[in-house]
Swiss-Prot record:
Segments for region (Disordered): 1-40, 796-819
Assembly notes: Interacts preferentially with RAC2. Interacts with RAC1. Interacts with AUTS2.
Name this polypeptide is given: Phosphatidylinositol 3,4,5-trisphosphate-dependent Rac exchanger 1 protein
Comp. bias regions, Acidic residues: 805-819
InterPro entries per UniProt: DBL_dom_sf, DEP_dom, DH_dom, GDS_CDC24_CS, mTOR-Rac_regulators, PDZ, PDZ_sf, PH-like_dom_sf
Protein location: Cytoplasm, Cytosol; Cell membrane
Organism this protein belongs to: Homo sapiens
Length: 1659
């Protein structure tokens, strides 16, 4: 074992590290004096290294000659063999000369050169062999490179152009494939670059050889001459000069890193992308490390200050041996994952340290994690962007090549298949094997022989390569899937012949392309599709073929007319359109073509009768969704078949089924999204059995009525239900297992009548008067039950009051009740039942809540499978309670603000001048106004909590005084579409079913009873609502909201009437919003930074106590570790509270010996997984010899080599930890100083200069000097008086705390000054509406994904289970994209312009909201598995989703562990009429507003897409599946291609070319929907009322989803939209808003008019 030393004899240390020593990389020989023994050892070592270099020169030369031979045989020979074919494809002789230049001359030179090398080094290289003269002999011949290098750029440009021609691209790929190279390893560009890379590599190799060749070696002078000669050769060629400079820069950098391990930089990287200093947390240590990001590699090092051991030197200088850094670790970026860390996080990987500006790096090869922290948010962003760019560059290139290669192989496979099926060839036939017949197969050796015969290949190796490529890409397979492709008598079969082929050609995406084109063509204001006359006949809704080609070229969809014609043929072949007289295939001519979908809508179809595959309505349903958890033995109910319907036969008393509200005789429509009412009864029983065996909760859709009559026994002694509220009174809670529950009474039902008399406008007491128990016993009448409540809030409130009464010693009865409540089943049901037989009945007429209106449709898909669609609208549950909680959070936030401001006012009572008086007066008025707002919010919250009916907010008809409902979303409904169909066995894909004329079979059910065929279930969810708006009357005099709001000093407010006309984006100046946000952010940052700083102090004190108390050895550490693991990492209470409790945050620093390096990446066994050599260096020795150094501590008093005084006896690892902690503390102090010195603080002082504070800005800034003095005191303490270190630290922290408090006070005043109280009220109302709708939409999509029903990737045949898991992982990693689509008309409707200006501001504020998840311990509410809690302030609101244990366990581990999700909100808006020619003066401004909104949103969506793309390109994040390349192409490349295409279209809509604005129409609406749907967004569609426009848009989007993902025939798209629009559940929304006027704009494009009722007979 060789220990590292600081320097090398002869000054060659740097060089040592630059090239790996095969025995001990980076290790230097211990210099034990200048004796002869040491010199001999050194000489032996140099010769050993020389042998390594000789081997490398010979090995790489052989590889290089192999590459040149491959280029010659695979490309040049092949092109010459097929001259005519090549020329036809575009590879003329001239093009070939440009591409390959004189590469054959280079090959001839290198054949001779290799022979000369092998002759010199025969038989095997030895260290005494001489090589220099070989290079000198060939130096003139290397001039052959001049021609090649000067031509290289031209060759690359030509190759880019040729690659645009599909036939050339396919031909070049096939050359590579037949040559035996895996097409995706290196592109042709890479091979063409290899001669330049090789000639540049020679000087580097010779330099290394010269370094290892001792002066006495006979080869020494020749090697030196050869090095100079090769440098001269390279410097004479410009291209190689540039390449050399790059390589030398990498080599130079590597030479500065001591102890380098693994392959050299110049071997695997081409450029340095980013470098910088970061804090790294791993294995309990915080260290400062220098990081270098290259393409393919991340390296991190420790910075060297100076030679270890020298006490006097204090300046940071280079080490004697020239190195600046000490190697610490490397990770190949192929195996590296990066995860963002929210500021303020403290978890296992950060070892309890609070992370700011940080991210995690995961080495998946070794499953090792560490955390990196940058000094600023900007620097962090720079690093994350660079890492994403590096990954994109690497993966995108590979994916593109894989796609091209796949397409080429698929086409070749199809061509060969048709040739082999020819009767003359007769290769594919039934063959005998032993006693059986193997149908439709061919033999490997016959196949290769035939390929040779027809000239497809020139040698047998090429045939084997082609066969293997066909096999790997899923075109052929061995008949029993046992063998790879062999040139032997082995049987293979084309997958076309046994139905296992999955088509993945570009045309496979024709369905989504066709739907997209149809929507875009029909969204134009100037239609291309219209009625046209020809020969005295009018053809309806047609377009000439040539016009379509022109349009496709103008829009950029196709590059050439040929490509456009191919797309047109694809559309005709796949059932989108046809020639009007069925006479011609699609051509670039003036013949008319029509979309089938238009025929179906306009009745021009020759076949008007309904066909079997048309979209048909099956049944209308009104139902309620029940959630039933499994019990010990069953679900608590039985079913039976009655009149071909599945009905409930019996329900157990007190069971969870009864609690959910299940009643005997009710029809069941669906169980866990399976439409059981369409199945045979035996299969329904099987479904229930399967669900129970896997202990899954049941989601039942059960028939119900809007109003029901319930008969309840009137018992004289107890009440088994509770009633609250008035007008109408409602059921607050029902006792579990009681008669009322058995009769069907459920919490939340509104009571309309009692015994026939109307009680709708009465209160709860009037209803209860009808019951004996209440009349006789009043409040004591409640029985001892486990109560099931209406909402979680009710359950919590009841529990709290119960606990309060239990604590009261006089409440004996309450205690008994509590005990009974915890027991179960709580009630002896026997005697009660006999009682109630004779007892009189009370009849209640109740209004049911949470009803779901649904419609079931069916159609036969393109694959011939019968599909069912259940479409429902649902009112979002709990939206009133959620609004109330948001208002309570706002009120609490305001209360703290008012309290702080009043405290501050009280501090400074002296009023000196008039400006002081005015400022004070303004502040008092504002505080009073905020106080009134708090009271209002509290009152509204109480109103909303008790509100039950109606369970949603209707569109208001006219303005009204402000009330609680103004904070709830209007007409908010969640539109669910559940699609189910049998999973088909893999069959020939769409494009091939047409080519081969095979009919896919209808998949029937398994004849065996109890065995179910697998089904596919998918749920799609879109919310419709009225755009959030402010429709309140101006505040009247004396009204609480009206006071103090009209003073001119309040900024933008200019009287209420003026404000009513405009929205927030106009009223709130961007600058005002930004400065207010900046004040609030700074205030919060200071708070957080101060808490964190105190945590570091606690950690340092803890560390010092372990150092200075040697008596408490291992046991102390062990208890510490235990305590640390049991405490939460970040306490919820403030630092002051924590110190009051006498507790401190403990962080365990106990680290196993072998982990004391940088997180194990750096120790011998964890080096880069692709290292070419093993490290034997003693990791602990090397670590303790050169200790951690910090730029913060690298001052005169404290260098990295300084040690604490000996009498403290601190072990070196503890010193390292102390350095790390102090480093972190000083980092925090620096960041606090930076915040307090920043421009925001200066602005706050400027704004509040009229308020008499104790100090001016100058005095305030001088306080920083105290902190600087405090720091130098700490450094002196470390050096001279370590016992006093805790006191020095305490002094520093006290100074900082005072400094921060002064800053926060100033910010409070500035905030008060710039707050506009009236606008804040409006902002709150609109924000609340948007947030509540967003939360309800996300929660519906989340539950679908947790139940494995979410799937936005159905068109790629991905299962809902995989897609759901992927989406959950995606949102955990990248956040939630919220897509809001607005169909408002700002140019023509003044109110809608105001709405648009309001929501633009508000939706951007949603980006500050975070979602997190907790587990629900116990649930006393039926049929809900999620409820919400709100924390935080307006600027950082946190929504906590409480999920039941079943769903919580399915969350990604990151979310289970408490990580939060961020919202990314995008608003796309488009008016549904052409405003270009409108005379209205505001139309241009409205158009500009839409343009700005869309541009900003597109940028956000593209940013999200970049993050998502990076996430999916991480191989390890994809579902682990050992399938072939083909599946990966399907589920990764095709979706990415589609997203790229959609982004391109969106850019053309948002930034149209000059003069092309009219040609894009309203296409932005369907395209933005598809883009966001594919990105996994939660979707919300809004218009003025949430009725006409938004509901039609949803119907269109749902029909498009069915066509893209679920095989709806293209001709049925508009038919489906029309039926869903006019007969679907959304007609209920119109029924609920009868007097509200809303209609489609007059000039709406054709797509939105086709489904409207005809006006005057015109469609």
């Amino acid at each position: 074992m060789e220990a590292p030393s600081g320097s090398e004899p002869g000054g060659d240390g740097a060089g040592d590290c630059a090239h790996p020593d095969p025995r001990a990389p980076g290790a230097a020989a211990p210099s034990s004096g200048p004796g002869p023994c040491a010199a001999a050892r050194e000489s032996e070592r140099q010769l050993r290294l020389r042998l390594c270099v000789l081997n490398e020169i010979l090995g790489t030369e052989r590889d290089y000659v192999g590459t040149l031979r491959f280029l010659q045989s695979a490309f040049l020979h092949r092109i010459r063999q097929n001259v005519a074919d090549s020329v036809e494809k575009g590879l003329t002789e001239e093009n070939v000369k440009v591409l390959f230049s004189n590469i054959e001359d280079i090959l001839e030179v290198h054949k001779d050169f290799l022979a000369a090398l092998e002759y010199c080094l025969h038989p095997e290289p030895q260290s005494q062999h001489e090589l220099g003269n070989v290079f000198l002999k060939f130096k003139d011949k290397f001039c052959v490179y001049e021609e090649y290098c000067s031509n290289h750029e031209k060759a690359l440009r030509l190759l880019v152009e040729l690659n645009k021609i599909p036939t050339v691209r396919a031909f070049l790929l096939s050359c590579m494939l037949l040559g035996g190279r895996k097409t995706t390893d290196i592109p042709l560009e890479g091979y063409l670059l290899s001669p330049i890379q090789r000639i540049c590599k020679y000087p580097l190799l010779l330099k290394e050889l010269a370094k290892r060749t001792p002066g006495k070696h006979p080869d020494h002078p020749a090697v030196q001459s050869a090095l100079q000669a090769m440098k001269t050769v390279c410097s004479n060629i410009n291209e190689t000069k540039r390449q050399m400079e790059k390589l030398e820069a990498l080599e130079q950098l590597q030479s500065h890193i001591e102890g380098w391990e693994g392959s050299n930089l110049t071997d695997i990287c081409t450029q340095l992308l980013l470098q910088g200093t970061l804090l790294k947390i791993s294995a309990g240590n915080i260290q400062e490390r220098a990081f270098f990001l290259f393409d393919n590699l991340l390296v991190y090092c420790k910075r060297k200050s100076r030679v270890t051991g020298s006490k006097k030197s204090t300046k940071r200088t280079k080490s004697i041996n020239g190195s600046l850094y000490i190697f610490r670790g490397r990770i190949n970026t192929e195996v590296m994952e990066v995860e963002n860390v929210e500021d303020g996080t403290a978890d296992y990987h950060s070892n309890g340290y609070t992370v700011t500006n940080g991210w995690k790096i995961h080495n998946t090869a070794k499953n090792k994690w560490f955390v990196c922290m940058a000094k600023t948010a900007e620097e962090k962003q720079k690093w994350l962007d660079a890492i994403i760019r590096e990954r994109e560059q690497r993966e995108s290139l590979k994916l593109g090549m894989e796609r091209d290669a796949y397409v080429m192989i698929a086409e070749k496979g199809e061509k060969l298949y048709h040739m082999m099926m020819n009767k003359k060839v007769n290769l594919i036939k039934d063959r005998r094997r032993k006693l059986s017949t193997v149908p439709k197969c061919f033999l490997g050796n016959e196949f290769v022989a035939w390929l040779l015969e027809i000239g497809e290949i020139s040698k047998t190796e090429e045939g084997v390569n082609l066969g293997q490529a066909l096999l790997e890409n899923g075109i052929i397979h061995h008949v029993s899937d046992k063998h790879q492709f062999k040139n032997e008598q082995v049987m293979y079969r084309f997958r076309y012949d046994d139905g296992t082929y999955k088509a993945r050609s570009e045309l496979e995406d024709i369905m989504s392309k066709g739907v997209r084109l149809y929507c875009r063509l029909h969204s134009l204001y100037t239609p291309v599709i219209k009625d046209r006359d020809y020969h005295l006949k009018t053809y309806k809704s047609v377009l000439p073929g040539s016009k379509l080609v022109d349009w496709l070229l103008a829009q950029g969809d196709c590059q050439t007319r040929e490509e456009a014609v191919a797309l047109g043929v694809g559309l005709c072949n796949n059932g989108f359109m046809h020639h009007v007289l069925e006479k011609s295939e699609f051509r670039d001519e003036s013949q008319y073509f029509r979309f089938h979908a238009d025929e179906e809508m306009e009745g021009t179809s020759s076949k008007n009768k309904q066909l079997r595959n048309d979209f048909k309505l099956v049944e209308n349903i009104l139902a309620k969704r029940l959630l039933i958890l499994p019990q010990e033995e069953d679900y608590g109910f039985d079913i039976e078949e009655k009149n071909k319907a599945v009905v409930v036969k019996s329900v157990q008393r007190g069971s969870l089924a009864e609690v959910a509200g299940l009643q005997v005789g009710r029809k069941i429509y669906s169980i866990n999204e399976d439409l059981v009412f369409l199945r045979p009864f035996s299969e329904v029983e099987s479904i229930l059995n399967q669900s129970f065996c896997s202990r899954r909760p049941l989601r039942l859709l059960v028939a119900t009525k809007a109003k029901e009559i319930i008969k309840i026994p009137d018992q004289p002694d107890t009440l088994c239900f509770q009633i609250r509220g008035a007008a109408p009174p409602y059921v607050y809670a029902v006792g579990r297992g009681s008669e009322a529950m058995a009769a069907g009474l459920c919490a939340g039902q509104c009571i309309l009548k009692v015994n026939g008399s109307n009680v709708m406008n009465d209160g709860a007491p009037e209803v209860l008067e009808h019951f004996q128990a209440f009349r006789s016993r009043r409040e004591e009448a409640l029985g001892l039950y486990q109560w099931i409540y209406h909402t979680h809030e009710d359950a919590q409130e009841a529990r709290a009051s119960q606990e309060a009464s239990t604590e009261d010693p006089s409440g004996e009865q309450a205690q008994e009740e509590d005990q009974a409540d915890s027991a179960f089943p709580l009630l002896s049901l026997g005697p009660r039942l006999s009682l109630c037989e004779d007892s009189p009945m009370v009849t209640l007429t109740v209004d049911n809540v949470h009803l779901e209106h649904g419609v079931v449709y069916e159609y036969v898909s393109t694959a011939g499978v019968r599909c069912h669609v259940l479409e429902k609208i649902v009112e979002p549950r709990g939206c009133f309670g959620l609004t109330a909680k948001i208002l309570e959070a706002f009120a609490a936030n305001d209360s703290v603000f008012v309290e702080n401001c009043r405290r501050l006012m009280a501090l400074s009572s002296a009023i000196v001048t008039m400006p002081h008086f005015e400022f004070r007066n303004i502040c008092d008025t504002k505080l009073e106004s905020i106080g009134q707002r708090i009271a209002c919010y509290q009152e509204f919250a109480a109103q909303l909590k008790s509100r039950v009916s109606p369970p949603f907010k209707q569109a208001p008809l006219e303005p009204h005084p402000l009330c609680g409902l103004d904070f709830c979303p209007t007409n908010c409904h969640i539109n669910l579409m559940e699609v189910s169909y049998p999973k088909t066995t893999p069959s020939v894909g769409r494009s091939f079913s047409i080519r081969f004329g095979r009919k896919p079979s209808l998949i029937g059910l398994d004849p065996e009873q109890g065995h179910l065929n697998p089904m596919s279930y998918t749920q799609h969810c879109i919310t419709t609502m009225a755009a959030p708006s402010w429709k309140c009357l101006p505040a009247a005099e004396g009204d609480p909201q009206g006071q103090g709001l009209h003073d001119g000093s309040f900024g933008p407010a200019s009287g209420t009437l003026g404000q009513e006309d405009r929205g927030l984006s106009f009223l709130l100046k961007q600058e005002d919003r930004e400065i207010q946000d900046a004040y609030l952010q700074l205030f919060t940052k200071l708070d957080v930074a101060l808490k964190e700083m105190k945590q570091y102090v606690t950690q340092i004190n803890r560390l010092l106590s372990t150092i200075t108390e040697p008596t408490s050895g291992g046991s102390c550490d062990a208890s510490l570790a235990e305590e640390a693991s049991s405490l939460p990492l970040v306490s919820e209470e403030s630092e002051m509270d924590r110190s009051d409790h006498g507790g401190i945050k403990k962080v365990c620093f106990k680290v196993a010996e072998e982990d004391q390096e940088d997180s194990g990446h750096d120790t011998m066994s964890y080096r880069d997984s692709y290292s070419e050599c093993n490290s034997n260096r003693d990791s602990v020795l090397s670590y303790t010899s050169v200790r951690s150094n910090s730029s913060y501590l690298g001052s005169d008093e404290m260098g990295s080599g300084d040690e604490l005084p000996c009498d403290m006896r601190i072990p070196s690892d503890k010193q390292d930890k102390l350095h790390g902690c102090l480093e972190h503390l000083f980092n925090q102090v620096d960041s606090i100083n930076a915040l307090l010195k920043g421009p925001v603080m200066s602005r706050a002082f400027e704004e509040t200069k009229h308020f008499p504070m104790n100090h001016s800005l100058q005095e305030f800034k001088q306080k920083e000097e105290c902190t600087i003095r405090g720091r130098s005191l700490i450094q002196i303490s470390i050096q001279e008086d370590p016992w006093n270190l805790p006191n020095s630290i305490k002094t520093l922290v006290d100074n900082i705390q005072r400094y921060v408090e002064d800053g926060k006070n100033q910010l409070l005043l500035a905030l008060l000054k710039c707050t506009d109280t009236e606008l804040q009220l409006r902002r709150d109302a609109i924000f609340c509406q948007a947030l509540v709708a967003a939360v309800c939409t996300f929660s519906k999509q989340l539950l679908a994904a947790l139940g494995y029903r979410y799937n936005n990737n159905g068109e790629y045949e991905e299962s809902s289970r995989d897609a759901s898991r992927k989406w959950l992982e995606q949102v955990a990693a990248t956040g939630v994209l919220l897509h809001c689509q607005s169909l408002l008309s700002p140019a023509t409707v003044k109110e809608e312009r105001t709405m648009l200006e309001d929501i633009w501001v508000t939706l951007s504020e949603l980006d500050n909201v975070t979602f997190s998840f907790k587990q629900l311990d116990e649930n006393y509410v039926a049929n809900t598995n999620v409820f919400y809690h709100i924390e935080g302030s307006r600027q950082a609101l946190k929504v906590i989703f409480y999920l039941d244990s079943y769903h919580f366990s399915k969350l990604p581990s990151r979310l289970e562990g408490g990580a939060s999700l961020r919202l990314h909100t995008a608003l796309f808006t488009k008016v549904l009429e052409n405003v270009e020619g409108l005379p209205s003066p505001g139309s241009q401004a409205a158009e500009d507003l839409q343009q700005d909104i869309n541009a900003q949103s597109l940028e956000k969506v593209q940013q999200y897409y970049r993050k998502l793309r990076a996430f999916y390109l991480e191989r390890s994040n994809l579902p682990t599946d050992a399938s072939t390349t083909a599946v990966k192409i399907d589920q990764l490349i095709r979706p990415i291609n589609a997203l790229d295409e959609l982004c391109r279209l969106m850019k053309s809509f948002v930034h149209p070319k000059p003069g092309a604005a009219g040609s894009v129409g309203a296409g932005l609406i369907p395209i933005s929907s598809e883009l966001c749907y594919r990105l996994g967004a939660c979707q919300m569609v809004m218009c003025g009322t949430g009725m006409q426009r938004s509901t039609l848009s949803v119907s269109l989007e749902q029909a498009a989803i069915l066509a893209r993902s679920h095989g709806l025939l293209p001709k049925c798209i508009m038919q489906a939209t029309d039926i869903m629009r006019k007969q679907g559940p959304r007609v209920e929304i119109l029924a609920k808003n009868l007097r509200v006027k809303d209609q489609m704009p007059q000039g709406a494009p054709r797509l939105y008019r086709l489904c409207q009722p005809p006006v005057d007979g015109d469609l």
